[in-house]
A protein has these predicted regions:
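Active-site cores of enzymes that catalyze phosphoryl transfer or operate on phosphate-rich substrates
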Residues: 1-12
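PLD/PLD-like phosphodiesterase catalytic module centered on the HKD motif
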Residues: 23-25, 30-173
């Protein structure tokens, strides 16, 4: 939270990403991440880790949705796979690393959750709930559309300008 020294939630996420050997999955309604988080996700994908991020296919806030999408291209160009959940708005905040460690809580992958708000999360390791989280991710991937390919190419100039402007305000969203 804002009254502590350090950014514990981001540190947990970064450590999980860095330690991943086989896969790292994340589900988050908002993807507005720091350069450090972007770099670690990309490095994990480049070293052969299956990195997948699920965001909503149906937005609750259109500006935040477009800002979230502005983070896709740099990630997918370096091997991260992006999915959008199609049945509705996905509000889960969970991660799964190598089928051994997971997080569940209120912490979004965004500036407000990671740096400004008081949030709660549970770090799980080697317990029965891990299997259930893995099954949940399998179901999520089944009903989500992978949008990785459409973000590998060039985006229109207008869209890039809009996304650059939105990113200026990202810490406020």
């Amino acid at each position: 939270g804002p009254l502590t020294d350090g950014y514990f939630a981001e540190d947990v996420y970064l450590n999980l990403i860095k330690s991943a050997k086989h896969f790292f999955y994340a589900a988050t309604p908002y993807l507005i991440i720091s350069d450090d988080m972007t770099r670690e996700l990309c490095l994990a994908a480049e070293r052969g880790v299956d990195v997948r991020i699920v965001t909503p296919g149906i937005p609750d806030k259109k500006l935040v949705y477009q800002t979230t999408r502005s983070y896709y291209a740099p990630l997918v160009r370096r091997g991260v796979r992006i999915y959008e959940y199609t049945p509705g708005f996905i509000h889960q905040k969970q991660t799964l690393c190598d089928g051994e460690t997971a997080t569940v809580g209120t912490i979004n992958f965004d500036y407000r959750s990671l740096y400004h708000h008081f949030e709660n999360g549970v770090l799980l390791h080697g317990c029965g709930a891990i299997g259930a989280i893995g099954e949940d991710f399998a179901q999520i991937f089944e009903v989500s559309r992978e949008v990785t390919e459409q973000y590998k190419g060039k985006r229109s100039m207008g869209l890039r300008i809009i996304q650059c402007i939105l990113r200026l305000f990202a810490p406020l969203l």
